[in-house]
Amino acid sequence: MTRDQKFALVTGCGKGGIGEALILEYTRRGIYAIATVLPTENSDHLTAAGITWFPLDVTDEQSVVDLKKSIASVTDGYLDFLVNNAGICYTMTAIDTDVSAVKRMFDVNVFGPMRMVHHFHDMLIQATGTIVNIGSIGGVVPYMYGASYNASKAALHHYSNTLRLEMSPFNVKVLTVISGEVGTNILKNDVHRNLPEGSYYSPLAVEFRDHVQRTPKTTSRFEYAENVVAQSLKSSPAAWFWTGSATGIIRFLDMFAWRTIWDFFFYREFNLGKVKDAYLANLKKDM
């Protein structure tokens, strides 16, 4: 049976983020795109755009179960595109990491997509659909202050690799997006974060504050969404699709350069020599 209408489900469609841009792009291309937002999150921007939306907390099993029932009633049991976009960030040095905060982040960034795939896989198989997992260059390179976030995205990348293999008997495709820096508000919860008192990285306290409050050179989220949606609509999408600011050079160096090239680059960019000098000076004081 041929279906004229295709359906997409995009998680994490809060105002100003990648999800909002993705949902609008799928809609523009004639896909019936369904958005999710957190139960506590404002959804006026979706209602105003005529987008069907449902509340979802990807860390809550029952919330995912309830969403599936709602989606199935709209799509008659089919789902052509599942876009696991919901994600949060945690910026901190590895040695100063608050593990409870990291557990929360992994629950969203890693276990969230796992829950979605677990509950929606039958609808995707029914539609011979595509799973789109939104990864990051952070899962490829050791970007400073991002050890925990980078680890969550690396975990998602490797989960996606195996998922791609395991879904192949059912002709369900899995697209992993390696995102560069994109203009979103994902850092909004980090702007007031400081290094803890007494941290070995205290010499970089000012630089750390500047980092979490930075406005990096980024790709427009709408340009990004256009590229991702176009790739997901292909009959044979890439296994890994690199798009966004800085992805070209990072992809090249990751393929052809030695593994520690990033140590050389980031040591200088983030002024780690200042930390070393302070550490050595303290050692001399104690002698």
Curated annotation (Swiss-Prot):
InterPro entries recorded: NAD(P)-bd_dom_sf (IPR036291), Sc_DH/Rdtase_CS (IPR020904), SDR_fam (IPR002347)
Pathway: Secondary metabolite biosynthesis
Gene3D superfamilies noted in UniProt: NAD(P)-binding Rossmann-like Domain (3.40.50.720)
A Pfam family per the record: adh_short
Keyword line: NADP, Oxidoreductase
UniProt-listed SUPFAM superfamilies: NAD(P)-binding Rossmann-fold domains
GO MF annotation terms: acylglycerone-phosphate reductase (NADP+) activity; triacylglycerol lipase activity
Entry's EC annotation: 1.1.1.-
One GO cellular component term: endoplasmic reticulum
A single BP term in Gene Ontology: triglyceride catabolic process
Catalytic residues as annotated in Swiss-Prot or TrEMBL: Y149 (proton acceptor), K153 (lowers pka of active site tyr)
Binding site for NADP(+): V10, T36, D57, N85, Y149, K153, V182, T184
PANTHER family: NADPH-DEPENDENT 1-ACYLDIHYDROXYACETONE PHOSPHATE REDUCTASE (PTHR44169), SHORT-CHAIN DEHYDROGENASE SRDE (PTHR44169:SF3)
Stated family: Belongs to the short-chain dehydrogenases/reductases (SDR) family.
Function: Short-chain dehydrogenase; part of the gene cluster that mediates the biosynthesis of virensols and trichoxide, fungal natural products that contain or are derived from a salicylaldehyde core. The pathway begins with the synthesis of the reduced chain in virensol C by the highly reducing polyketide synthase virA via condensation of one acetate and 8 malonate units. VirA has interesting programming rules since the first 2 ketides are fully reduced, the 3 following ketides undergo beta-dehydration, and the last 3 ketides are only reduced to beta-hydroxys to yield the trihydroxy portion.
Protein name according to UniProt: Short-chain dehydrogenase virD
Lineage of producing organism: Eukaryota, Fungi, Dikarya, Ascomycota, Pezizomycotina
